[in-house]
Amino acid sequence: MDMLIYLAPICALIGLIFAGISYKNVQNEGAGNDLIKKITASIHGGAMVYLNRQYRAIAVFVVFLAIIIALILPNGALTAACFVFGAVLSATAGYAGMLTATIANGRTTNAATRGIGPAFRVSFASGTVMGMSVVGLGLFGLSLSFIILESVYTDLDLLTIVNIVAGFSLGASSIALFARVGGGIFTKAADVGADLVGKVEAGIPEDDPRNPAVIADNVGDNVGDIAGMGADLYESYVGSILATMLLAASTAATTFPNIPVENVILVPLIISAIGILASIVGTFFVRTNKTESSAIHMAFNMGLIAAIILTVIASYFVTSMLLGEYGLNVFFATVAGLVAGFLIGQITEHYTSYDRKPTLRVANSCQTGSATNIITGFAKGMESTLWPVVIISIAIYIAFQLSGLYGIAIAAVGMLATLGISLSVDAYGPVADNAGGIAEMSHQKEEVRQITDTLDAVGNTTAAIGKGFAIGSAALTALALFASYGIAVGLSAIDVMNPNVFIGLTIGAMLPYLFSSMTILAVGNAAGEVVVEVRRQFREIAGLMEGKADPDYGKCIAISTHSALKEMIPPGLLAVIAPLLVGLVLGPGALGGLLAGSVASGFMIAITMSNAGGAWDNAKKYIELGNFGGKGSDAHKAGVTGDTVGDPFKDTAGPAINILIKLMSIVAVVFAPLFM
């Protein structure tokens, strides 16, 4: 173990170096003409101002919670240090992704003047910075924390050391929740405000420079889908590895007799390290010069499949070497997670792509008005829970039968092992979306806009797939953390006949609904302020509609920023306070019930909201292609309404529930000593 464990931070550093190379490649691309540079600078400036203000606000929470951890927990000072370290690295990953995306958008537009190949290369290189930064910083921080604690504090046993390292995961979760909620509120407030007044009331196209909220809308794409998604999956990535290490330290003696505990702890770290290398190799398979969206999809799938195959092959040798006779069982549990993640992505694509039946049915319903569109879309969202639940259930069953609770955790590690490339694919989308907006605002030729539209259309699908993947990985990670909590407090089962446990179960099932309500209302409040401001500018700025005067873009950015930072606090506090209160007042069994209830209901709500929102979005896009009357028709107006309702579903509430269930689970794990 002494030498092999260093493979984790070494591979993590290789991932970070690759991210740095990708950043330089993006930076070396031409930035375009003066107008492209001006628009890019506005988006970049707005995004970085928001991110800096958000991180300053979160820093207050991090410092406060770190002090509490240091004062009340055993080994509190060390746990608090890991907590702060995890938070800082999560913020760093978000900063790197945002910085790159907001310089890559204009460069992608400029590259599109040379063809789809150069534009695709720039946008994907930007996504690679986010993907490799997340896995590199996550694995580096987690493995380094473990190595330092094991080397310096030799009097501590392995279980105690891993429990201290759990603070790192709590830090990641804390940043993730605020980044996801705050980013989701910002992006959808700007998006809804821009669409309602611009498209519906003023009748101007999307990304029209006359719209005062258009820059805020483009800033929001980066805030929500780069920093927010990155923090979400960083949390899942770190949480799955940490949960597996915890279960290894606590159950290895019974699950894997005669195998050194150190070997069992090493497995998730080494599989994740190999996944980074496989993801880097996979990026070299993502190449295309064809203009069809199907060719771009194929390029992405080639990269993902290559990374998965390499990870599967390497995982076989790792598990066989470290776990001996038990290696094959753990290997198949890992594969179960990998396959489940891939299949959930395919199911998500089926329900949200406009060339598949569910979304086509939603688009068709727009012909009879907004109400039937909302009804059909919501029904399809609920229907879409079936197969993800079946897939996750089968993966859990297989993993548990093969390797017990450790198998479930290693399945989550397997699902996230190739996160480096899957997040790179996901983070490409907002860059392509921004590039299309910049092409529109800078009055590029029609063929340039066609290229950016093609890239954007693929980006919409990859974003939907990414959300499905994030939900599935969140469910497995939360379950693994829940198992770790159960072992820590001595829960062998959740006894629903116990009144306290049943109370905890019902509270847990309710929390995702309350949380969703808070975040959706926050979007509504913030969007209302943006709508009022956009209407004011159209009314008061002479010559704005005629294109003779410029709008005040900064005002809408300022409103969205202020609203997001103000509204993200109550949901964030709920996720931390609820498990602590239930655990302290009703006991560890009730808290176990709360975690079980929140995972079960949260998984369903997140899938429903994400897929319903994705279907409404792409149903509108299908109509905009000229179907059912095209743009400006009654069907299109109904489609815009559905898309507007779906925006906070798929980009705010749904994704944030992932973090809610994971954060409550890691809070329970870290503060478990208080409940015993």
Curated annotation (Swiss-Prot):
Q: Where is this site: Important for ion transport?
A: R180, D225, D232, D651, K662
Q: Oxidoreductase: present as a keyword of the record?
A: no
For the protein in the UniProt heading, the enzyme class is translocase
Q: Cofactors per UniProt?
A: Mg(2+)
Binding residue positions for Ca(2+): D617, D643, D647
A GO biological process this protein is involved in?
Answer: sodium ion transport
Give the binding site residues for Mg(2+) 2. Answer: N218, D221, D433
Q: Which residues bind Mg(2+) 1?
A: D191, D195
This one is known as Putative K(+)-stimulated pyrophosphate-energized sodium pump
